[in-house]
Amino acid sequence: IYKPVSTLITQVRVDPFDAAFSYPSKEIGRFMTEAEAKKEKDKGNHVKEIPGKGYQRVIAAPRPIEIYELDAIKALMDAEQIVIAAGGGGIPVLQQGTRLKGASAVIEKDVTSACLAESLDADILLLLTGVEKVALNYGTSTETPLDAMSVEDATKYINENQFSSGAMLPKVEAAVSFASSGNGRKSIITSID
């Protein structure tokens, strides 16, 4: 089956008062020595020590509010194009009057995907990852793969810290957000295999 593919740079509005700006937590960039980390701090950047690896910059990871190119995405889909949008979570921007300003932040790509799927009134959100199934107690001798879970169970597992913050947690949070956003909506987290 042949279909044309369009890629679209996607600007995503975030709230300047999102708590994530007060508590930067998303690790970015290379690992640094203590001296390099001090220079970064002197520039006004946030730095976090990563045990056994050194130091790394951290920036805000606010929640997406609105995808500005939504009309363009819909038009391309109506033209039967395969649309690649919101790559890497999109470009975080702040609304300032009638202008947009880039935000020093990153947006979790899975959360942006849920926002986009909801905005497009999709029925299913498919999140691909490196494992076939979400698991409880991942990487331990009591690891339990899950075939399915309800929004209530997923929320309970999130509150129990069952999912790694850098890997599975954003996917499960996005799945819960999307599945909760309308009747009959489902989220699937699996590998491409």
Give the role of each language-model region:
Residues I1, A60-S119, T129, P145-D193:
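Polyanion-binding loop/helix "lid" in catalytic or ligand-binding cores
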Residues S6-L8, L126, I188:
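A structural signal for isolated positions on well-ordered beta-strands in alpha/beta enzyme cores
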Residues I124-S141:
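Active-site pocket-lining segment
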Residues N45-E49, G87-G89, G139, M149-S150:
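Short, flexible segments with low predicted structural confidence
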Residues V12, G88, E132:
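Short, glycine/serine-rich, charged loops/turns that create anion-binding
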Residues I1-V83:
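Ligand-binding beta-strand-loop-alpha-helix segment within the catalytic cores
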Residues P16-Y23, L94-T98, L136-S141:
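Short acidic, glycine/serine/threonine-rich loops at helix termini
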